[in-house]
């Protein structure tokens, strides 16, 4: 009976230790930056992403590239580096494929944008929003007089 008491006591003592904080997922860490992007506050998103420092995440690189491309004075050179890194980390990252394709159109590189579209088509076997968006951007680009 005494051994049962001691086992119960130690089991309770083990349970009473302070709970360790569960580490946040990358998605949770990036959520404030995503919210800033949705609000159109790209400078704030860049600051939040810099603070989050998730350089092993394709999503982080994609969001940084997007924010740099969409801010008031776009930085296409840096944005392109982030998209390329995102795609090196995840070759089928749909967001990076779409946004990099759009950046390539800004650089008047239709051939490269269409290559991103082809890669996106493979990544979205049954279609996806990113594929439709990049197709639309390419169609609009082609419709503009040059």
Placement of each model-derived feature along the sequence:
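Terminal, low-structured helical/coil segments at or just beyond the last alpha-helical repeat
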Residues: 16-26, 114-146
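Structural signature of tandem alpha-helical TPR/SEL1-like repeats
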Residues: 39-44, 72-85, 107-116
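Canonical tetratricopeptide repeat
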Residues: 63-64, 99, 133-137
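TPR alpha-solenoid repeat register
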Residues: 60-62, 96, 130
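Residue-level recognition of tetratricopeptide repeat
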Residues: 34, 66-68, 102
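Structural marker of alpha-solenoid helical repeat scaffolds
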Residues: 55, 89, 122-126
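Register position in tetratricopeptide repeats
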Residues: 38-39, 70-72, 106, 123, ...
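Alpha-helical segment of the N-proximal tetratricopeptide repeat
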Residues: 24-52
